[in-house]
Amino acid sequence: MTTGRAQLRQPFLFVGNHPCLDFINTQMIVRGNPTDLLGGCEDLVAWLVQAHMVDKVQATVVMTQWGHEDQEQLFEQGITFRRTLRDMAARIVARKSIPDSAIVSINKILSRCPGYPQLVRKKGGYTRQFQSQAAQKDGLLAPLAEAASDLLCSGKWSLVKKCGNPACILYFYDTTKNHTRNWCSMQLCGNRKKVAAHYQRKRNNPTL
């Protein structure tokens, strides 16, 4: 299995406006090819740090004090949970019910994770953030499980959307004023689709 941050071909994207969706978006399409930004435990931990799910001290404990087997187990748990979250997001977008298996997966992680909530300042106010403790292997995924439960309990499901580009697999939580966001980002998909549409119109009507 490929491990190590150096193997990443693309930087992490944080365009989902929600931790669960940003985690799902570590799988993306690059030049028409499915690409996984998580190649091993080091990548997973790096993402958790960048997403403010764990701090650098916890990350150092995992990468310097955990054995290879424990690191691999954490990575596999993360990938499995990501698969659960992707299915959950797809069902929300399709207006389908969430399967009990997803709830079981979320609760399983929450039940095994020591930690505590903290009040964190953010732009325009405050938010509550779960601070996990790295003593337990499952503890590193606790903030993601907490975010998933928050999305299901407090989020507006109608604002969970998949990018309007059929070739894109990224999800986002629409926080725009009128909730009219269609693209994962203008840079990745929005501008390209607009340019393509303009080109097609010019072909169909050269006088434009």
Where are the regions that the model predicts?
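Short helix-coil boundary/hinge micro-motifs
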Residues: 1-159
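Cys/His-clustered metal-coordination modules, chiefly Zn-binding fingers
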Residues: 127-208
